[in-house]
Amino acid sequence: MQSLWSGYGRIQKVDLRFQESDRSQSAIVKFVDAAGAGEAHPRGWNGGASHTRKIRSYEVERNFYASFSSQCGDQCRVAKLLGADLHSPASESDWLMVLEDLDQPSHRGDGFPVRKSGVSEQELLACLSWLANFHAAFVSIDAPAVDDVLWPVGTYWHLATRWDEWDVMEPGKLKDAASIIDQRLNDCKFQTLVHGDAKLANFCFPASPGLVAAVDFQYVGRGCGMKDVAYLISSCLSDAECKRQQESLLNSYFNLLEAAVNARQDIEIDFSALESEWRELYRFAWADFYRFLAGWSPGHWKMHGYSDEITTRVLRELER
């Protein structure tokens, strides 16, 4: 089907045949070849820190599917883990996961065979609904349950894993404030699991409008849900669309999140306090990603006027 980023393996669709019957089932095999990696990164980021981060990311994904994915219901659908090398730590070698093929219908309903390069308002709301239900499923998760097996701080652009990119940033207020912005997000009282790479390309859509599924959990870890929301919006909307739709999209997300949190019987959350904190952190999450882009790919199309305005506002707040 496709190669993994920078030559770290491949993803293939296979047919599983069962010995006890004539039944077969399609599945997705994600094969990681750490020793064979080494394709040139399109922007030159191929150093030791990058390699270590990628190796860890595949181990994290394996751990997520093995130990956390079962907590994701139909409202935040993920693939079922069918098999994997789960008992030895990821190392400089080969390993694989066998996952449910989300394209195919199952006993849980229709499949998700469609991928999008652009979305309607309804489709974007479906992605926000997935995020809201995912965040609700793991809200207030304890650090000890996460930190040794997933990322202690989720997202692929987390500052502690991106010092190489920070180092090449142009000197200025954003570079100086990077650690403060990062710490503001890390100090969030209401923590959940964030997907960590919640771009449009990682959502799978049904043939007819409805719920969506998500893939690619290499950077899942603890954090503020606004990291996922800001990143999703940045992957879908233009400068003008971000400005025009920000408030309505945030309102929709928080309505969906409140309903999902209230549906849980095992926790008590002061949702008003959560919403107040996370709304305040939305712009910090956006500025944090902008910081990453400023080092990784200066001039990236996502560094538009809306991003500039939000980041400037954050920097001004920090100067007070």
Task: Give the role of each language-model region.
Residues 1-5, 17-26, 93, 268, ...:
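Regulatory N- and C-terminal appendages and interdomain linkers associated
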Residues 50, 63, 219-264, 285-304:
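Active-site activation/catalytic loop segments of kinase-like enzymes and analogous catalytic loops
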Residues 79-84, 203, 269-277:
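A short glycine-rich, hydrophobically flanked beta-strand micro-motif that places a catalytic Asp/Glu
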Residues 110-120, 214-219, 232-238:
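Short helix/strand-bridging catalytic loops that position acidic/His residues to coordinate divalent metals
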